[in-house]
Structure formats: structure tokens, C-alpha cells
Amino acid sequence: MTETTIFQKIINEEIPCDKLYEDKFCIAFNDIQAQAPVHFLVIPKKPIITLLECIEQDANLLGHLLFVGSKIAKSKNLTNWRTGINTGAESGQTVFHLHIHFLSGRKMNWPPG
């Protein structure tokens, strides 16, 4: 059996979060380990570990996650932000439930690592 992640516990309302948005497909909340003045996550309610596990039927869901993040960013009057998905431990993924980072409020450097 797969370990229940902190994100699944948030989805199940077992632990609180600073929720920004929720619908039947996803939930968005502020990152508790913010790396920028604005740093929120959008996660699917479907338990997908990484992009590697996505299948063709997930394409609309992935687009929805990006759309929701953009909608939240616009509601915060953001005009510049970075969007990122870490896939696997070596990329920096620490919670193994797919999530999209939206960061803003400071100049982003490249390369990011």
C-alpha cells in the first residue's frame, strides 16, 4: 500500500491548509515552505505521483491545473510568475503527489537549481 502523502491528507481534510481554490478536480493552497513572496501549489485530487505516471486521459486535468493556477495568479494581480513541476527526488520533488508550483514576487534566476 502506498504511503498517504501530506497532500492527500490536505485533500481528505485531515490537516488544514491556507486554501486558495478548490473544485472537484483540484485544490490550490499557499506553500508552507515558500521560496518567494508568492508561492502556491495546485494539486490534482487524483493521486498521481509524478508526470511519469500521467496517461493520455490526464491531459485535460493537467491543463485544468495550469488554468486554475493562472486564474489564481491573475486574481492576485500578478503579471510575472514561474511555474514548475518537479518529477522525481533528484529534481527536488519531496512530496510524491503531483503538484505545480507558482512563484512570484521576486526576480527569478536561471538556471533555477
Language model region names:
Residues M1-G113:
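HIT superfamily nucleotide-processing domains
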